[in-house]
């Protein structure tokens, strides 16, 4: 079977960031204003007073201390509470494409490739800026890449599903070298007026170059030994925004048009599903648990990852074995595990093995077994 490698990764990080302290200050001011404006109805039991937030609650619930965003001014304004992004004409690059370009150039440089070497582009992320034309085709045009491109969405698992799709296409001969981009503006689908989730997400974009091992000349190259993806339908993580909203007479302010989740149910159901996926995947490939030197997991919740790591390894993972970037980036959906992989893979030795795994809405989960080549 043709050996396929990830030969380069790139990360675009927005310039602006928001600390828990800043986020709490803005939310609490909004909540206090809401409670004051609705005092009479709250006293009559017609409305429920909003509970204030605090930094300790956020960190204990998630492990998050900071998040990067495309716009912090609107998010931190108690009268707005959402990012404000400039509207662009059709002749200007879309925001997702612009982010993708920056991450792509980083990945191409690390892989030692130019756009002329790429013959396919996959945009894999949890939220696409528009229905059509595909963001990936725009990225293809802006980079001057020939071949073909397409978008795909499997929520937080999009990047690992894209790795499987790209590896399969290269093996089948559909393409030789593929660029994957994962642009995520998660702040755009987050309700910053909701205490239970206003702290969860951040914005970022990652990129990867996949190619045949024989053509790779990267100094940090990982062979894709095996891929395994699973899905299981659940409403516990949901966003009802879509092209039929107008036909359904939905209001842009409807709560279900933003991110919603049943956090406790998600934790209870996803942790065993993902743990078993990784364990089964390693068993099927006849790889012993002791051989695993690194777990690059989806960065959604530190406690969730701690449980998964302990279940897979049979012990509490050392910090270097299961790198955590949540405290700095928050949940960046499909990009999270790729950030962890990009930042914490160069120290691995030749032939050492690790598992890249992402999981989330759907439910969906993708496991990629990687071996360091160079």
Where are these regions (language model features)?
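Short acidic, glycine/serine/threonine-rich loops at helix termini
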Residues: 17-18, 132-135, 163-164, 189-195, ...
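Condensing-enzyme catalytic core mediating Claisen C-C bond formation in acyl metabolism
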Residues: 1-93, 194-268, 276, 371-374
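Short beta-strand segments
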Residues: 7, 124, 153, 178-184, ...
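Claisen-condensing/thiolase-fold acyl-transfer catalytic domains that form or cleave C-C bonds
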Residues: 101, 108, 127-128, 141-142, ...
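Buried hydrophobic positions in well-ordered alpha/beta secondary-structure cores of metabolic enzymes
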Residues: 6-8, 58, 107, 121, ...
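Conserved beta-ketoacyl condensing-enzyme motif
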Residues: 6, 50, 54-154, 282-305
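Flexible, glycine-rich active-site loops centered on histidine and acidic residues
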Residues: 174-205
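Acyl-CoA/ACP chain-elongation machinery
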Residues: 182-183, 190, 232-239, 301-304
């Amino acid at each position: 079977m043709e050996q396929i490698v990830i030969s380069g990764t790139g990360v675009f990080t927005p310039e602006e960031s928001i600390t828990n302290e800043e986020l709490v200050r803005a939310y609490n001011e909004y909540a206090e204003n809401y409670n004051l404006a609705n005092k009479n109805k709250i006293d009559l039991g017609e409305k429920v007073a909003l509970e204030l937030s605090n930094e300790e609650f956020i960190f204990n619930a998630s492990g998050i201390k900071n998040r990067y965003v495309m716009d912090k001014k609107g998010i931190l304004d108690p009268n707005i509470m959402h990012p404000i992004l400039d509207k662009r004409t059709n002749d200007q690059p879309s925001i997702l494409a612009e982010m993708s370009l920056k991450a792509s150039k980083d990945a191409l440089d690390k892989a030692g490739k130019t756009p002329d070497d790429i013959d396919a582009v996959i945009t894999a992320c949890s939220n696409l800026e528009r229905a059509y034309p595909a963001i990936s085709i725009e990225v293809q045009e802006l980079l001057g890449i020939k071949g073909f491109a397409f978008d795909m969405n499997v929520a937080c698992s999009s990047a690992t599903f894209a790795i499987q799709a790209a590896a399969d296409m290269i093996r089948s001969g559909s393409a030789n070298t593929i660029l994957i981009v994962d642009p995520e503006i998660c702040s755009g689908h987050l309700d910053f007026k909701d205490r239970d989730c206003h702290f969860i997400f951040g914005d970022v974009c990652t990129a990867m170059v996949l190619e045949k091992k024989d053509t790779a000349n990267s100094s940090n190259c990982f062979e894709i030994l095996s891929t395994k993806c699973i899905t299981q339908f659940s409403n516990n993580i949901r966003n009802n925004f879509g092209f039929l909203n107008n036909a359904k007479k939905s209001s842009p302010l409807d709560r279900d048009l933003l991110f919603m989740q049943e956090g406790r149910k998600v934790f209870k159901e996803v942790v065993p599903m993902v743990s078993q996926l990784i364990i089964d995947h390693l068993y099927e490939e006849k790889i012993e648990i002791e051989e695993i030197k690194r777990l690059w997991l989806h960065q959604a919740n530190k406690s969730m990852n701690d449980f998964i790591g302990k279940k897979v390894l049979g012990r509490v993972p050392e910090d270097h074995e299961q790198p955590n970037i949540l405290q700095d980036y928050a949940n960046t959906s499909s990009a999270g595990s790729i950030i962890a992989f990009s930042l914490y893979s160069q120290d691995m030795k030749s032939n050492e093995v690790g598992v890249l795994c992402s999981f989330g809405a759907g439910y969906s989960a993708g496991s990629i077994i990687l071996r360091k080549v160079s």
